[in-house]
């Protein structure tokens, strides 16, 4: 366990956040839909809606491609969060949850803005779902019900996505207040943002 106080402590934690974000970004660079499309001779970013995510893969390449893209994009965020948890849990037990969040956010950034594809990736829905599952699994059931329910009723993935993010934020506030997030109180405001 590493304990630094004052400026050195803040600098170390900033460094840990940057490392976690970087790890997440690297995982997010794995563009499942783009790579699957390329294996089929198609650049998914020049077809359909033009993004490399699950919905466009499903529409352009079919159900198999959609499921593979969803699974890959979901898993890359989960793996990034789990790796950061393993790397930092002993050194920063009170801060590991915030570092997990940075890793998940980094994965979404890498997915949405991959540098090697001129920052043109997916929309981050499946990747965000993976982050939610890994960082705050308590929030996942309500998010899943809202997502599936809203799509079944309206056929709008974008509405489902908005409901998931809104629901996640509300649930994190509630779970944080109730102490279910297992995060040091000093990090709660940052976790909420």
Place the predicted regions along the sequence by residue:
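Short, Lys/Arg-enriched N-terminal segments with co-localized hydrophobic residues
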Residues: 1-12
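Feature marks short, highly hydrophobic, charge-poor N-terminal signal-anchor/signal peptide-like helices
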Residues: 13-19
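Alpha-helical transmembrane segments in multi-pass membrane proteins
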Residues: 20, 24, 29, 33, ...
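Cytosolic, membrane-interface loops and tails of multi-pass inner-membrane proteins
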Residues: 34-64, 121
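Interfacial segments of multi-pass membrane proteins
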Residues: 58-63, 84-88, 124-154, 167-176
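Membrane-interface helix termini and inter-helical loops of multi-pass transporters
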Residues: 89, 177-187
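Membrane-helix interface "capping/anchor" motifs
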Residues: 114-120, 149-166
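Loop-to-transmembrane alpha-helix initiation sites
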Residues: 141, 157-165, 184-193
């Amino acid at each position: 366990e590493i304990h630094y106080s004052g400026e050195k402590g803040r600098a170390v934690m900033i460094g840990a956040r940057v490392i976690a974000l970087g790890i997440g970004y690297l995982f997010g660079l794995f563009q499942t839909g783009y790579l699957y499309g390329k294996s089929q001779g198609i650049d998914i970013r020049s077809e359909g809606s033009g993004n490399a995510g699950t919905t466009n893969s499903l529409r352009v390449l079919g159900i198999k491609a959609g499921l593979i893209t969803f699974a890959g994009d979901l898993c890359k965020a989960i793996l990034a969060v789990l790796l950061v948890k393993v790397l930092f849990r002993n050194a920063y037990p009170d801060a590991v949850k915030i570092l997990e969040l940075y890793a998940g956010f980094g994965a979404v950034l890498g997915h949405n803005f991959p540098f090697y594809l001129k920052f043109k990736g997916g929309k981050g829905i499946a990747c965000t779902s993976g982050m939610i599952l890994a960082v705050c699994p308590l929030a996942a059931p309500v998010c899943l019900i809202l997502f599936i329910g809203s799509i079944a009723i309206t056929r709008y993935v974008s509405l489902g996505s908005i409901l998931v993010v809104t629901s996640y934020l509300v649930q994190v506030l509630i779970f944080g207040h109730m102490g279910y997030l297992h995060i040091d109180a000093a990090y709660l405001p940052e976790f909420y943002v």
